[in-house]
UniProtKB/Swiss-Prot annotation:
Associates with the EF-Tu.GDP complex and induces the exchange of GDP to GTP. It remains bound to the aminoacyl-tRNA.EF-Tu.GTP complex up to the GTP hydrolysis stage on the ribosome. Keywords: Cytoplasm, Elongation factor, Protein biosynthesis. GO terms for cellular component: cytoplasm. It is found in: Cytoplasm. This is Elongation factor Ts. HAMAP family: EF_Ts (MF_00050). It comes from the Bacteria. Residues 80-83 are annotated as: Involved in Mg(2+) ion dislocation from EF-Tu. The keyword Protein biosynthesis applies. PANTHER family: ELONGATION FACTOR TS (PTHR11741), ELONGATION FACTOR TS, MITOCHONDRIAL (PTHR11741:SF0).
Length: 308
C-alpha cells in the first residue's frame, strides 16, 4: 500500500476543496492515486472536481498573432517572471509568433526557420546566453479557414500580442470580415473565461464521457436511486456536463439572458450577412501542466549551515 504523505493530502485538498480527513481517506482507499481519489470523492458526493487541476508554475509568455484567415498561439517559457518582463525576451516571443504564422505550428519547423543570420533556435540560444536564464519554446498551435476570420485575445497582456493567456478562434464564413472580427474577439474572450474543453459533445474524448457517466451512475447507486432511474438521471447529468465543458453549449458570457454560444453565433449571422461556423479554438494558459520544482527553505538554510 502506498504511503500517504501530507503533500498528497494537500494537493488533493487544493484540487477538490474537500476536508483534510476525507482527502486522507480517499487516498487510502485508492492506494495514493490522486485521479482515482478525486473520482472516489465525487462518487461520495464530496467533490465537484472533474479532474485533477494542472499545477501552473512555469513563467514566460503566451504569444498570439493573426492575419486574416490564419492565426497562431505559442508558449515560450522562462525560469522567472523577471525575465518575462525583459524587453529582449518579449521581442523574442513576438518574433517566434511571426515565424509560426509563416511556417505553421510544428516546433521543429519553427526552430529551424531562418531569422536574420541565424535560426529561431539560434536566437533562443543567444537570448539564453545574454540574459543568463534558460528559455524554451514549449508549444505552438495554428488555425486557418478558407474564408472568414481567425481572431485572438490575450488576457493579462504584458505587451501587445503577449501575456499570461492566449486564445485563437477560427470562424468560417463568407460574411463581412469586420463583423466577423468583432464576434471572433468576443468568442476568444469567452473561451479565455469559460475554458471549454471541446467544441461540442461529439468532439469530447469518448473515454472522458464514459468516465463521467460511470462516476455519476456510481454516485446515484450509493444514494440508493432505483437502477431503472439511474440511466435517465445520468443522461440529464451529462447534458449539464456538456453545458459546462462544450463551447457551443456554454452560456455566452457576453449575454445576460443566458443564451448559449451556439445561439449567439446564430444571431450574429444577421450582422455578418452569412452563415457562421466555429471551426476550432485553442486556449493556452501559461505553464499549465508544468510543475515547478519546490524546495524546503528551512532545509536549505540548515544544509548551508552544515546542520542536519
Amino acid at each position: 500500500m502506498a504511503t500517504i504523505t501530507a503533500a498528497m493530502v494537500k494537493e488533493l485538498r487544493e484540487t477538490t476543496g474537500v476536508g483534510m480527513m476525507d482527502c486522507k481517506q480517499a487516498l487510502a482507499e485508492t492506494d495514493g492515486n490522486i485521479d482515482a481519489a478525486i473520482d472516489w470523492l465525487r462518487k461520495k458526493g464530496l467533490s465537484k472536481a472533474a479532474k485533477k487541476a494542472g499545477r501552473v508554475a512555469a513563467e514566460g509568455l503566451i504569444g498570439a498573432l493573426t492575419d486574416g484567415t490564419k492565426g497562431v498561439v505559442i508558449e515560450v517559457n522562462s525560469e522567472t517572471d523577471f525575465v518575462a518582463r525583459n524587453e529582449q525576451f518579449q521581442g523574442l516571443v513576438k518574433m517566434i509568433a511571426q515565424v509560426a504564422l509563416k511556417v505553421g505550428a510544428d516546433l521543429d519547423a519553427i526552430n529551424a526557420a531562418p531569422v536574420g543570420s541565424t535560426t529561431v533556435a539560434g536566437a533562443i540560444a543567444d537570448a539564453i546566453a545574454t540574459i543568463g536564464e534558460n528559455m524554451t519554446l514549449r508549444r505552438a498551435a495554428a488555425l486557418s479557414v478558407s474564408q472568414g476570420v481567425v481572431a485572438s485575445y490575450i488576457h493579462n497582456a504584458v505587451i501587445d500580442g503577449a501575456g499570461k493567456m492566449g486564445v485563437i478562434v477560427a470562424l468560417e464564413s463568407a460574411g463581412k470580415a469586420d463583423e466577423l472580427a468583432v464576434l471572433g474577439r468576443q468568442l476568444a474572450m469567452h473561451v479565455a473565461a469559460a475554458n471549454p474543453q471541446a467544441l461540442d459533445p461529439t468532439s469530447l474524448d469518448p473515454a472522458v464521457v464514459q468516465r463521467e457517466r460511470e462516476v455519476m451512475a456510481d454516485k446515484y447507486r450509493q444514494q440508493g436511486k432505483p437502477e431503472n432511474m439511474i440511466e435517465k438521471i445520468v443522461e440529464n447529468g451529462l447534458k449539464t456536463y456538456y453545458k459546462e465543458v462544450c463551447l457551443l453549449e456554454q452560456a455566452y458570457i457576453h449575454d445576460e439572458k443566458g443564451k448559449s454560444v451556439a445561439q449567439a453565433v446564430k444571431e450574429a449571422e444577421g450582422k455578418v450577412g452569412a452563415p457562421i461556423k466555429i471551426v476550432g479554438f485553442v486556449r493556452y494558459a501559461l505553464g499549465e501542466g508544468i510543475e515547478k520544482q519546490t524546495s524546503d527553505f528551512a532545509a536549505e538554510v540548515a544544509a548551508a549551515s552544515g546542520q542536519k
